[in-house]
Amino acid sequence: MAITIVSVRARQIFDSRGNPTVEADVKLSDGYLARAAVPRGASTGIYEALELRDGGSDYLGKGVSKAVENVNIIIGPALVGKDPTDQVGIDNFMVQQLDGTVNEWGWCKQKLGANAILAVSLAVCKAGAHVKGIPLYKHVANLAGNKNLVLPVPAFNVINGGSHAGNKLAMQEFMILPVGASSFKEAMKMGAEVYHHLKSVIKKKYGQDATNVGDEGGFAPNIQENKEGLELLKTAIAKAGYTGKVVIGMDVAASEFYGSDKTYDLNFKEENNNGSQKISGDVLKDLYKSFVTEYPIVSIEDPFDQDDWEHYAKLTSEIGVKVQIVGDDLLVTNPKRVEKAIKEKACNALLLKVNQIGSVTESIEAVKMSKRAGWGVMASHRSGETEDTFIADLSVGLATGQIKTGAPCRSERLAKYNQLLRIEEELGAEAVYAGANFRTPVEPY
């Protein structure tokens, strides 16, 4: 007898920021229960699929009871009797038939909510792996038609600024990538050691308070100069003895400080802001180029506003060979926006966030499209996370080559890194760590 879905239930749980989010349980006819929870971002791109929130005064408007109800009343009953291994069929059914809402960038999930659809999509994927009797990462690889499993290079967000932190720093994330490690296990060692050295460097320079951690486990010292963040990383990497082996990545999240006057305000968090730090896209572009010359930077994410295609393309053509230019708010994991960016040569790497697009199938499509264009792919958490580890398996199964899921601190971040350690151990001699090939770990599939 074929194993089928017998029930789908959702509930409201809490993310790592104490805000409500959606968790779904998919129960199968053999008694197996697959469970998945969705994350939520702080700096969200305006083109992301619609996340349904209740509004009103409960939970300060952030409740998800409507999304939960949509799973329990609309999606759940409609999936009973379906084959959990048919990921594409189930995702398309939810997105195109049960929801059916469309905007200029495709299926926008406005009726049921991307958070409702995704929770079920992730749980169905876990259920499908169970039915096939294979680990989740292998099931994901099979769904994508990928033959090569690869452990990603972790990009640890160790200094927080932007919308993630209460300091004056405009740029949102300063990351370390252990590209010189020979395994994921060694990469974790390097990352953790640099993190602890960074903590003592910051404590010595700015005092104990500066070592409090932000939403993603990174430190948020009260510095204003973005260059100072890079300097701290360089020092910590050297103190740990990993110069040349651990390199730097940045997530600028520039949409957060882009004004209607088309300037970028590096002073946007200052209360008495007199506009003295407002700069043009060209000046900002040259600032990045100076950073790249002075520091071992291999990756810059969201360097410009999500609609500033012109400066994205300029930066990519000028430094794209040496540095990956990652589209997050620009692309929002949306296949149509990825297509546009490929055509306009706007960037050369995709940030993969399943909750930006709202289904496993569409996420896989965005990744395949990116890889065929010769781009890099970085799987990513959100700042409001849960203990769910789906993205760890997703990253290995799709051979993204890179993953960012916070600092080596805070359990909702370590949950993903620890899962990757388990996967590497399980693969044994077959385990491949992306290392220096993090931008193109496998041939396109």
Swiss-Prot record:
Transmembrane segments: none annotated. It is found in: Cytoplasm. Mg(2+) is required for catalysis and for stabilizing the dimer. One of its GO terms (molecular function) is magnesium ion binding. The active site is at E216, K353. Pathway: Carbohydrate degradation; glycolysis; pyruvate from D-glyceraldehyde 3-phosphate: step 4/5. Keywords: Allergen, Cytoplasm, Glycolysis, Lyase, Magnesium, Metal-binding. Its EC number is 4.2.1.11. The keyword Signal does not apply. It holds the Pfam family Enolase_C. Substrate binds at H164, E173, E301, D328, S380, H381, R382, S383, K404. Mg(2+) binds at D251, E301, D328. This is Enolase 2. It comes from Hevea brasiliensis (Para rubber tree).
